[in-house]
């Protein structure tokens, strides 16, 4: 038989070539939302860290649909988003060949976790980054120069972006080096943007000032790495029949005799995962507050709802597996997102104008699951577990030893 008697589309997309390891660990924003001067000044992106997944119960609000007013169970991802610190302002001018940086101004005080980003080995370095630059803010000549820079930015720039970094010390991670990124400022005139950014130099910006409840956002990140994989796993090609000589997880024909080369479009073994990807339209189900102290008491009930009044935090019993406890502000997104736990994710405002009913649907959570994610969790809170288990032997022994 000289040819197959049927045709089939190729396996795997060529739109994501080359399938190699990403050169950057933090997701890069390749385009920011279009600016609208009629809106108030706001940021367009934020950085967060993937903590893990859980599930929720909510009531669907979709009049006319069969599922309207019915309860549904949905998977959600928790992304921890501690406030970001603004440390710089960048002005861009539009040229025939695209945007060009015009001026960059850094803040007077920059924390060590941000300075670490400018060194390969912080321990062995002199730690002198920005020491000369920061003196500009102290003498008269430097202050005049900075004022001149700000005025020229107001005059010539069309795009204003801030430089902001994450606060690693607030997270349950070993890493001390902060992630640094430029975030575009949209809304208002250039002068208003610059004044807004200047007011917030060295200040913290919380996530609830960037995103809102029920908003659709895009998540940019690097996927979970899988290492070197064969064609069946990497391209999802069909397995060959059982009796095939020299293996069946292969491609039977890798091309014609001539041209005497293998085409780039033929599925081959190689790197799978750790690719840079942008996923659009992830709905925010909840923007949660971190732990806070009120009247001398630690308040943790950020997973309570109007229907589930139990005093519980978003953390499952034992914490999120391979992450730890979420103690800062967090965002709850519908479904899954790219990357492993602890992976830094870039959250960006949607580039599209959302008009679909599903995108504009109001989310009313009834219940957030906080059972242990390590094994078959049964209990929502520690109190519930203690009430069911009764006094344990180890507790009795500890009590006797104490007495």
Swiss-Prot record:
Residues found modified as Phosphoserine: 13, 304
Q: Which InterPro entries match?
A: L3_arc_euk, Ribosomal_L3_dom_3_arc_sf, Ribosomal_uL3, Ribosomal_uL3_CS, Transl_B-barrel_sf
Name the record gives this protein: Large ribosomal subunit protein uL3
Q: Which organism is it from?
A: Rattus norvegicus
Cross-referenced Gene3D superfamilies: 3.30.1430.10, Ribosomal protein L3, domain 3 (4.10.960.10), Translation factors (2.40.30.10)
Cell compartment(s), UniProt: Nucleus, Nucleolus; Cytoplasm
Query: What domain of life does the UniProt record list for this protein's source?
Result: Eukaryota
UniProt modification remark: Constitutively monomethylated at His-245 by METTL18. Methylation at His-245 regulates translation elongation by slowing ribosome traversal on tyrosine codons: slower elongation provides enough time for proper folding of synthesized proteins and prevents cellular aggregation of tyrosine-rich proteins. It is not required for incorporation of RPL3 into ribosomes.
**What's an example Gene Ontology biological process for this entry?**
cellular response to interleukin-4
